[in-house]
Amino acid sequence: MLIRHLALLALTVALSADTLPAIPPRPEALKFPALNYEPPDPRQYRVALKAGPVAYVVPDRELPLVTVSILVRSGAYLDPVGQEGLAAFTGGLLVRGGTATKTAEALDERLAFLAAQMAASIGDDLGMVSLNLLSKDLPEGLALLREVLTQPRFQADKLELQRQQTLQALQQRNDDSSSIEARELEALSYGNQFWAARQPTSVSVNSLKREDLQAFHRRWFHPTNFVVAVSGDFDRASMVQALEKLFADWPFPGEVPPPIPTNLKPAAPGVYVVNKDVPQGRVSILLPGVLRDDPDYPAILLMNDILGGGGFTSRIMNRVRSDEGLAYSAGSSFPAGVWYPSTFRAGFQSKSRTVAYATSIVLEEMKRMASSPVTEEELQTAKRSFIESFPENFNTKSKVAGILAREEFTGRFAKAPDFWKGFRARLDRVQRDDIQRVAKQHLHPERVSILVVGNQEEILKGHPDHPVSLDKLVSAPLTELPLRDPLTLEPIKAEPEAGTAK
């Protein structure tokens, strides 16, 4: 009997093997059915509230939780000159500073009792207030949220704590070369006078008073400046009613914020060096960017992925790290600006003596993108990385609400409500000659601005095995940028050498 069963089993396995497809010799030869996915339709979730805001209401009964996010038309671009940091302070203390009826400590205690999380912040061009809590506690949570939005206390001791923490952070701005690089990147990318290049100083931080935060809040925190994203365990109609109540009868009028300034003035091509005694130099290679509505952006996105945005599949990473071992990480980014063109940046960190050589390799790869077509394999790899990962952008209801609210906030819904529906098709239509065409249009190695932060003397020596001179990579003079005082941002004067007059 046992022998008969074993024989039947062997026969079954053999027959099954004959009907199964053969296993390919390599993983990349595996074939899968085409991905069939449609992104959410924003019109299905969009609600124009009578109280002013547009809300994206996305029910999700999987867990007894609700997330409310409010996007606020505000930002550091509204900081008055001399009060840099005002927006950040206002956002940072909106929740942590208590309300008119609750001290900061009492509000924290109540939120903790509800196991709720409430947070607020204001960045460059966007404010955000969020609430996450159990659905059974939603009525009380929304009542607390309204208090925070309409009656923030900006408690004096919390303001002083924020001030001291900020001053301490400013004091450390030169401790790491990455923070120096970030500071100078803003100035080179947009110009010293552009609002995004202005940064807090000890003077501006010390000037901020509670009345300044209150005035900033009352000007911009009004329902007409809000876009709302809500997801979680609720009935749609009931949530809409709750939101109408949340934003009704606002106690102050507010103002419509002015347009975000776009008067950027990028630095002239050249090499810019900040001398910092560190063993490795940080390098950023910059070129003017594009707006997100540029019709060529799908091709630009794929081009950058092949050049340096695709990690270990990208050319810059392969040349600088894998082939030459000059950096742990190297790559590029080509973000599309919403309000003004963002900046193309290629960058890495390398030992001082190999900075020039590594920079020359990146410039070579930029030139090669424009001078010869990419391979079909490179193009298909880049396409797959975006197209196949696309559904992950919407794999939770919270993500759906958040993305759709941002589309509303930035105005894309009004211009192209079906943008995401056609996104993959636009990528898939890009051909090899499109990649080369946009590379020729946007990648100009002879016009780059190169920012280097590191030991200038060692960097300029170069490497004996690679006769590349940093100051010869661009036909423009090398400019020494001063290291700035971390508190005042004024140039630090060099210490006189021993034996010289002071």
Identify the residue ranges that each predicted region occupies.
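Short acidic/His-enriched helical or mixed secondary-structure segments at domain edges of catalytic enzymes
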Residues: 165-184, 262-281, 318-327, 372-425, ...
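M16/insulysin-pitrilysin zinc metalloprotease superfamily fold
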Residues: 96-102, 131-163, 310-311, 335-394, ...
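Histidine-acidic residue clusters that define the catalytic metal-binding segment
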Residues: 27-48, 187-226, 258-263, 390, ...
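M16/MPP (pitrilysin/insulinase) zinc-metallopeptidase core fold and M16-derived inactive scaffolds
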Residues: 67-132, 175, 195-199, 310-326, ...
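An aromatic/glycine/proline-enriched structural segment found at the starts
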Residues: 20-30, 227-291, 452-495
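Acidic/histidine-enriched segments that form metal/cofactor-coordinating
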Residues: 19-27, 106-216, 262, 268, ...
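Mature N-terminal segment immediately following signal peptide/propeptide cleavage
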Residues: 31-71
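A structural supersecondary motif
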Residues: 76, 284-288, 308-350, 403
